[in-house]
Amino acid sequence: MPRASEIKKGEVVDLNGQLLIVKDIEVHSPSARGAATLYKMRFSNVRTGLKYEESFKGDDMLSTTQLERRQVAFSYIDGDDYVFMDNEDFSQYMLKKNDIEDQLLFLTEEIQGLQVLMVDGQVLALELPQTVEMEVIETTPAMKAASASARTKPAKFVTGLTIQVPEYLEQGERVKIHTAEKRFMGRAD
């Protein structure tokens, strides 16, 4: 059983008989001497989808459950359901729009590296790759004398995502975006 300080985002924890997927972790280090570092974790219940929040000391022991990860490709949308197809056995997995709302900003037809997280054959969540490539569909025109300095401008993508990009980029260019931080990484190869 791992300590609370060893738990990472995306892991499944068994807490009070409920399977909870770790959505976010905040670390608080109190300034008082002898005070333990606190780990405030936000969970989502695997079965019900309800949100839950709990704080742990760094040396608290937590029970984790092994996840099965399956490589998938985005297939189609059916009402509020997003359908993904397994890359190996072509079985289909459905996820509700509410469950993957954060990931929808990066979900395009050509996205590669998607995984579904499963426990006991039940789909829990969708995991995005660390970076995705997307095409800029709307941004202000590049300035003639724009240098590769730190000046930025907003750029909009087909999914509705808007991030800051260097001002030398133009509409139609493909860029790499860090999915967790929603930030520009560089031009796509």
From Swiss-Prot:
InterPro entries: Elong-fact-P_C, NA-bd_OB-fold, Rib_uL2_dom2, Transl_elong_fac_P/YeiP, Transl_elong_KOW-like, Transl_elong_p-like_YeiP, Transl_elong_P/YeiP_cen, Transl_elong_P/YeiP_CS. Belongs to the elongation factor P family. One of its GO terms (biological process) is peptide biosynthetic process. GO terms for cellular component: cytoplasm. Transmembrane segments: none annotated. It comes from the Bacteria. This is Elongation factor P-like protein. One of its GO terms (molecular function) is translation elongation factor activity. HAMAP family: EFP. CDD domains: S1_EF-P_repeat_1 (cd04470), S1_EF-P_repeat_2 (cd05794).
